[in-house]
Amino acid sequence: MKKGIKIIAAAVAIITVLITIDRIPAIYYRLLSESEQEKTSSDSSHGGILALVNSSHKYVDTGEEKVRLYDKKSDSFFLSTSEIYLDKRAVEPLCKMLDDFKNTTGLRTINVISGARSVQSQKDIYNEKQLKYGYLYTKKFVQAPGFSEHHTGLAVDLALFNSEDGTSEDFDGKGKYSWIIENAWKYGFILRYPEDKKSITGIGYEPWHLRYVGIPHAYYISKNGLCLEEYIDLLQSKSQSEPLKIAVGKRTYKVWHCESKPKKASFSGDNCGGYIAWK
């Protein structure tokens, strides 16, 4: 009898694993498939999901379409204002991730507080922080106007909101909230400013700041402990004949750098004078 119980228990465990695996396509493989068809909306090497914007690489407006997050969201999370906009390619993945976070943890506390910003908005924030905290603090956590990746609409800042008493607090990525940090890559997002990369990114640790780069790239960056700067640098030495190979999901991607817009491949400008291609 005990043997029979063990067999049944083992069968249930196997079924549970299969169900868990079977859930992946709905939240993962379709987004992965869509990332295979990624293109910039212009021929510019300055635009696209892998465009690097930091203190050394100024933002260039290439006309990427931005949409209002309020019009696409569910009730799984909050917005600090209805006028938060994001690059259209980041909207559905973000909503899916936050829906899944709520369904997994039961927490309806995530508050999206920032998305796309104009240069003027960044200037206002930069000046306000300087007046309040001083230059050194501001330089550590806020990019100068024109050099913030918030201009791209591919970056998002999270906070926490308690709907019962109306209080808010910083998102620290700890406890149940670590789910977002650990699973962000499945939706194409990365932790943009890791704690151990301050000397490279030039920005202090920001667990609340996520950047959309697409699933294959997010997977490689996250699993190899890189920041976006390191990933772009790595790809500079990769060519179509000798690409970086990324095995993720059911696919193996070939990723490489090229000087001109590639043909028959998904691509993004790197904002460093070239393009990143993958297929």
Give each language-model segment a name.
Residues 4-10, 15-115, 119-279:
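Extracytoplasmic cell-surface/polysaccharide-interacting catalytic and binding patches
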